[in-house]
Amino acid sequence: MPTTIKRTVFFVSDGTGLTVEALGHSLMTQFEDIEFKQIRIPFLTSVEQAQEAVARINGQGESDGMRPIVFTTLVNPELSSIVHQADAFCLSYFDTFLAPLEAELGIKSNHTVGRSHGSAESSEYKKRIESINYTLAHDDGITDRDLEEADVILVAVSRCGKTPTSLYLAMQFGLKAANFPLIPEDFDRGRLPGTLEKHRSKLFGLTIQPERLHQIREERRAASNYASLANCRFEIAEAEKMMRREGIRWLDSSTKSIEEISTTILQELKLR
């Protein structure tokens, strides 16, 4: 069996790091045979912090025996220059795209930290925080209160990716995303939980290949009926049958990234 290639990746930002991480992930997913160790360095706003980041990056490179990869979204040219002195392969989104965009638009950018997320007082920021809180409070069917406020309600059997997808929708798009598990009792009744019936237009289903679900569940609860391949096949077949019968839009998440799943949901439910 070939040895898996391992590389360390740093995401360095003067803000939360969500933007640079999302951009980096979109590139990293193109290299399926490499195992990436990911380290985030957010809120880098001073020379001292930049120097500390360089020391950390260099130390990691010495430990790995291979230089790290560094993705940055540092607006301040001085801080960006310091980080680029690290013994690493550095990719700056602002250095790569901002200058050509300034040339095309014929105007200099503001070089203002945090413009992509807005200030803490902005309505967009508040909306995103509210969405994250709502999503956490409505994870895995914890409660069915206030479902009328949801932008989307994900349904699937356990371990199909409902929670990470819900959080991604909340964090990246400011959507209130609830999610509910489909359980054996639902299959016995042959219909959706009653609390979801009146919110049918907001429902979106996730499914997965039974073999992949078996692998995931074995890591959580090995040698159990819950994780058995036979049970995984049964649950997936019943869930897909129910979603077809109820007219719920759904997709197979087996080989898709959270970004791809989320984009499909946005398009199918016309949320963007």
From Swiss-Prot:
EC number assigned by the record: 2.7.11.33, 2.7.4.28
Domain of life: Bacteria
Pfam families according to UniProt: Kinase-PPPase
Catalysed reaction, written as an equation: [pyruvate, water dikinase] + ADP = [pyruvate, water dikinase]-phosphate + AMP + H(+); [pyruvate, water dikinase]-phosphate + phosphate + H(+) = [pyruvate, water dikinase] + diphosphate
Keyword Kinase: yes
EC category: transferase
Binding site for ADP: A156, V157, S158, R159, C160, G161, K162, T163
Key words, A-Z: Kinase, Nucleotide-binding, Serine/threonine-protein kinase, Transferase
Gene Ontology molecular function terms on file: ADP binding; ATP binding; phosphotransferase activity, phosphate group as acceptor; protein serine/threonine kinase activity
InterPro entries, per the entry: Kinase-pyrophosphorylase (IPR005177), PSRP (IPR026530)
Family: Belongs to the pyruvate, phosphate/water dikinase regulatory protein family. PSRP subfamily.
Main function: Bifunctional serine/threonine kinase and phosphorylase involved in the regulation of the phosphoenolpyruvate synthase (PEPS) by catalyzing its phosphorylation/dephosphorylation.
PANTHER family named among the record's database cross-references: PYRUVATE, PHOSPHATE DIKINASE REGULATORY PROTEIN 1, CHLOROPLASTIC
Full protein name: Putative phosphoenolpyruvate synthase regulatory protein
